[in-house]
Amino acid sequence: MGNEPNYGFFAMLDRMQYIARWGLMRNSKTENIKEHSFDVAVIAQCLALMYNRNNNNEGSLQVDPYKVACLGLYHDCTEILTGDLPTPIKYRNKEITRAYKEVESEAARTLVNLLPEELSDEYLSLLDPQFKGEEGAVTKRLVKAADKIAAYIKCIREESSGNKEFLSAKETLRESITALDVPEADEFMRIYVPAFGYNLDQLNGNG
C-alpha cells in the first residue's frame, strides 16, 4: 500500500453483512443490516412514487423517489461502527436518543473520511442527512415508514417459519406504522404486505 490514501469506504460498507439485527430475539433466519437496507430502499422508493401520485395537483410538493430510495439504502450504514442498538433502548428517553444521534453523526464523519475529499460531502448527506424544509420532512417520514414496514415484513417471515418470538414485535410495529399517519405506508401495507405471507405457489397465482 505504501503511502497511498486509505479509501476503504466501500469495503467498510460491505461489512454491513456482519451486523445482525434483532440481536435480543431468537431468529429462525438471521437478518443483517445490509439485507434490511435493501428492503428499506425498495419500499421507500415505492412510498415516494405513491406520495407523488397522491399529491399531483399543480403546486404540490413532489419528492425525488431515487433520492428517497438512496437515503433508505444508506440509513443504517453508521451501525458498522455503532452496532445495532435495540429500538427500545435507543428511544427510551430524549437524552439517550439525542446522545445516540450524536454518536451516529460522528460515525458518519468517520466513514466519509475514508473517501476522497471531493466525494465526502455527497456521502455525508446520505449517511447523516439534514432533513430541511417541507421536502426534507416528507422524505424523513417516508424513509422512517419504510424502515418500520421492512421490520414488520421480517416479523411476517419469522411467523411464517413457525417462530412465535416475533408476534409481539409484529403487533407493536403495526401500531407504530398506523401512528405515523403516512397514507402511503397504510396503502403499501394494505396492497403489498399480505403477499409476504404467501408461499411460492400462491405468489405465482397457483394457490
Region roles according to the model:
Residues 1-207:
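Alpha-helical, largely C-terminal catalytic domains
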